[in-house]
């Protein structure tokens, strides 16, 4: 039974990757694997649920990067910004699919059900994540809820006020949604996607610098997206390396941001 469901998910994923969101139907998925539509309906009540579950498969590289980041010692704000950069890097290339997945259902029901359905079939995709990150990926019902986990931890650590955590959660989500919406249907080159990811991160970092508690500043260590050459390799990824640092000398100033190449 489980093997059959995986076939349906993977066939829908292949159609999404090859032909786009509007190309997927129960009939096309059934034709792709040589089964009847009735067989699919035994596992998925409608095409929207199948598309949502299959869309989670596009997050595999993002989850792999999160697995790598979970092994690096970072505070909650550093980790949150790194995760946002990873999510932007992958989702902007499939803006239509991710806009539909994250925001196609305003109450978050589609995303949470898709996450649950996908990881029931592919629990191995979550292997190696730390406990709180595992919970964050598996249990968060919306993008905003995932964001709030780390922002609230930062507030508990005294890096943000509670009000700032709420403000940044809203801002992060609205900005991400706006970027996805703007990118839908646009035919861009790889350099263009890097540029919009860079723009997204610049806007986030500027916003975060205005909300840090006194005594903290943001240091952008390496604002690059690919290490040395243009070949993308998950194990060689070099993206924003953000450090939230204490300001040790002189009066602390909110909104101070430093960047070095």
Model-assigned labels for residue ranges:
Residues 1-19, 23-32, 49-52, 73:
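Basic, helix-initiating cap at the start of DNA-binding domains
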Residues 15, 90, 94, 179:
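Short alpha-helical functional segments enriched in proximate histidine and acidic residues
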Residues 33-44:
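Short hydrophobic/aromatic patch on the recognition helix
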Residues 56-63:
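Short, basic, alpha-helical segments at the C-terminal edge of helix-turn-helix-like DNA-binding modules
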Residues 107-156, 202:
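Amphipathic alpha-helical packing segments from all-alpha helical-bundle domains
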Residues 141-161, 165-261:
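C-terminal peripheral helix-coil segments that are non-catalytic and often amphipathic
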């Amino acid at each position: 039974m489980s093997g059959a469901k995986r076939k349906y998910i993977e066939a829908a994923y292949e159609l999404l990757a090859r032909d786009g969101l509007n190309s997927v139907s129960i009939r096309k998925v059934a034709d792709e694997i040589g089964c009847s539509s009735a067989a699919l309906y035994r596992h998925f009540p409608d095409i929207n649920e199948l598309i949502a579950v299959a869309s989670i498969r596009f997050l595999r590289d993002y989850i792999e990067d999160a697995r790598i980041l979970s092994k690096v010692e970072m505070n909650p704000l550093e980790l949150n910004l790194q995760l946002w950069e990873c999510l932007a890097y992958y989702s902007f290339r499939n803006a239509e699919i991710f806009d539909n997945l994250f925001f196609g259902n305003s109450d978050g029901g589609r995303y949470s059900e898709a996450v649950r359905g996908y990881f029931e079939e592919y629990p191995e995709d979550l292997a190696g994540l730390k406990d709180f990150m595992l919970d964050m990926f598996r249990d968060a019902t919306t993008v905003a809820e995932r964001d709030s986990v780390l922002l609230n931890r930062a507030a508990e650590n005294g890096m943000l006020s509670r009000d700032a955590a709420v403000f940044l959660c809203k801002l992060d989500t609205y900005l991400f949604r706006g970027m996805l919406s703007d990118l839908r249907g646009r035919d861009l080159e790889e350099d263009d996607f890097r540029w919009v990811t860079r723009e997204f991160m610049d806007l986030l970092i500027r916003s975060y610098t205005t909300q840090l508690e006194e005594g903290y500043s943001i240091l952008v260590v390496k604002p690059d997206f690919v290490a040395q050459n243009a070949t993308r390799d998950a194990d060689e990824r070099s993206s924003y390396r953000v450090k939230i640092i204490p300001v040790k000398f002189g009066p602390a100033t909110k909104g101070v941001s430093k960047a070095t190449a």
